[in-house]
Amino acid sequence: MSVAETEEGVFEATATIDNGSFGTRTIRFETGRLAQQAAGSVVAYLDDENMLLSATTASKNPKEHFDFFPLTVDVEERMYAAGRIPGSFFRREGRPSTDAILTCRLIDRPLRPSFVNGLRNEIQVVVTILSLDPNDLYDVVAINAASASTQLAGLPFSGPVGGVRVALIDGQWVAFPNVEQLERAVFDMVVAGRIVGTEEDGTPDVAIMMVEAEATDKVIELVEGGAPAPTESVVAQGLEAAKPFIAALCTAQQELADASGATAKTGAEYPVFPEYGDDVYYAVSSVATDGLAAALTIGGKAERNQRTEEIKAEVLERLADTYEGREKEIGAAFRSLTKKLVRQRIVTDHFRIDGRGITDIRALSAEVALVPRAHGSALFERGETQILGVTTLDMVKMAQQIDSLGPETTKRYMHHYNFPPFSTGETGRVGSPKRREIGHGALAERALMPVLPSVEEFPYAIRQVSEALGSNGSTSMGSVCASTLALLNAGVPLKAPVAGIAMGLVSDDVEVDGKTERRFVTLTDILGAEDAFGDMDFKVAGTKDFVTALQLDTKLDGIPSQVLAGALAQAKDARLTILEVMAEAIDTPDEMSPYAPRVTTIKVPVDKIGEVIGPKGKVINSITEETGAQISIEDDGTVFVGATDGPSAQAAIDKINAIANPQLPTVGERFLGTVVKTTDFGAFVSLLPGRDGLVHISKLGKGKRIAKVEDVVNVGDKLRVEIADIDKRGKISLVLVAEDDDSAAAAAADSPAPADAATASS
């Protein structure tokens, strides 16, 4: 790490990431050159070709009427960063891509808890992607850039925050892997954290604040080849491996802030508005504790919420005159008291608000085939959380086309998550998905990607929709379970079923033998209230053998390694229980729905693709019209043929093979052909796609002379014909076959041979 003033007012700090045999990556932060009117601005570079600008600004006046912290994070992808013009109609960037939205969430999650409580000034962080090597990912660079610019803005911010992607490649955890290296990775995770002190050996003590992780789509293949499986212990090792890299990035950001003079800013000009005064909390506690403690033992969410709202109304009525004009403080103090009672009961009694023990899972239910015409459907319930999963299969050409700075250009598996307001018994806006819905859908998608069959094994585009019909804790992990069930119901040959569970953590200082010690209690299958009042939201999805996806957010300054390892082990026990319940509903792929298309794959020579398509698509369109099948051709000669019934698909395949993989007809073969052209000298009949024969006018009259071909046949007529001759140039001469001749030939083929007949008569 190094820091320098490269020119007057321009400062630069560098962190070098050493990956051993995988080489080094250099992260460089620069301030003082671009966006100087922002409160804080930083240009972050990854090696030489990746360049991001982050600017942090704050409103002059606080929004005192807000009861939340108004932080906004935006990521602006500029297509010029990759030397491209946007593909939209207006040829300029529009709404943010899914990659940009997910990066916004990655930045927001560790940054938000790093601000002081009670801040009400509007804070906006805008990260603009200026240059990007197509072999690199920008999301983790954006986390560091956003943290660095916020650190320079003089805000009441307890950063800096460092973010790193580490991937398990050839048994080593590699930081900032590129796209090419990720092709060989077993597991990949983004980890963010900050330095909170110093270890006994003098190394920085890093508190992990956020984790977003997943197994790669090649994990099963790599593990079968000898790579380590991403088990709970391996994932825990990866989290520890990320800490030195985070420390280096945080140190570089701090050095930049020190050199530029930003650390001299105290943030005193930004007032803090406590949610309530101590006097209000004391009054609320005095009148509400007993009744609220009793209400929090009610098992049902609706009944419990109704009773707590009644108590809250009683408290407001009793204290309204004493604390006139401070009703919002009374409400905030009531919430704080609720949080204290919930946490106290968990830590001291290991008992939860719905009566469960700390490792108990709510009642589970799973069933499939609920939606009649859907290709696959399932309902998964865990307590009051209810998820409907619906699967739709289609041709591979229906894969999503992606126009963003990410490495993906198409997406064959699309997972969409919907969270309507009625799922929590409320009213609200419905319509286009919000960032939270996009994030939850992406998490469920990543959990299932490692077990999906390849396009060669299952040549379909797959759309999975998760409908959150009821919510009381981790609808995203419920979506993973419902999706596994629906995919199996649709006939998708998953490599293994996947289930997910949400874990929580509550910590407090307790007196033990006259000493105060920190006690951590890990909760299995958290409720919505336990998520809101707890210290950690830890979602883990996986098969019975390994983890496929993981998401962690914590409000603590670090979680001990043994606590995290224990949470992972506890999550596995719960996952295995859920998988057993799911297996009772369905454990192998069902037969495909009669409403789903049957897709068959064939190969044609690349030089025959043009012939199959025909001029302006004439040939392929005619095959589609005649057979009713859908046809999609890839550049490598792979042809996908889809139809709702087998005969239609086979008819299309036969026609394609006749063009691209032809077998020449022989003299004596009979066909039911279509007249495609008439001339003065005869009628051309299509025998196979791309292969016609001529019935001469002299052969059309059945022994009688005719003056005009159209007097006997017209274009579109069906004729039963036989190949009479094929000349040296391949031209085919045809003769008509009478229907009775054809029937006689068929009967002769079915009758016994003469020798057999003689034997029978004797």
Curated annotation (Swiss-Prot):
KH domain: residues covered: 597-656
Catalyzed reactions per annotation: RNA(n+1) + phosphate = RNA(n) + a ribonucleoside 5'-diphosphate
InterPro entries xref list: ExoRNase_PH_dom1 (IPR001247), ExoRNase_PH_dom2_sf (IPR036345), GPSI/PNP (IPR014069), KH_dom (IPR004087), KH_dom_type_1 (IPR004088), KH_dom_type_1_sf (IPR036612), NA-bd_OB-fold (IPR012340), PNPase (IPR012162)
One of the record's GO molecular function terms: polyribonucleotide nucleotidyltransferase activity
Domain S1 motif: 668-737
Keyword terms of this UniProt record: Cytoplasm, Magnesium, Metal-binding, Nucleotidyltransferase, RNA-binding, Transferase
KW Chaperone (keyword) present: no
EC number: 2.7.7.8
Residues noted as binding Mg(2+) in the record, renumbered to the chain: D531, D537
Primary location: cytoplasm
PROSITE patterns in the cross-refs: KH_TYPE_1, S1
Gene Ontology annotations of biological process type: mRNA catabolic process; RNA processing
GO cellular component: cytosol
Pfam families: KH_1 (PF00013), PNPase (PF03726), RNase_PH (PF01138), S1 (PF00575)
Coiled-coil stretches noted in the UniProt entry, renumbered to this chain: none
Localisation per UniProt entry: Cytoplasm
NCBIfam families for this protein: polynuc_phos (TIGR03591), pppGpp_PNP (TIGR02696), PRK11824.1 (NF008805)
Protein family per UniProt: Belongs to the polyribonucleotide nucleotidyltransferase family.
Function: Involved in mRNA degradation. Catalyzes the phosphorolysis of single-stranded polyribonucleotides processively in the 3'- to 5'-direction.
Designated name of the protein: Polyribonucleotide nucleotidyltransferase
Species whose genome carries this gene: Mycobacterium marinum (strain ATCC BAA-535 / M)
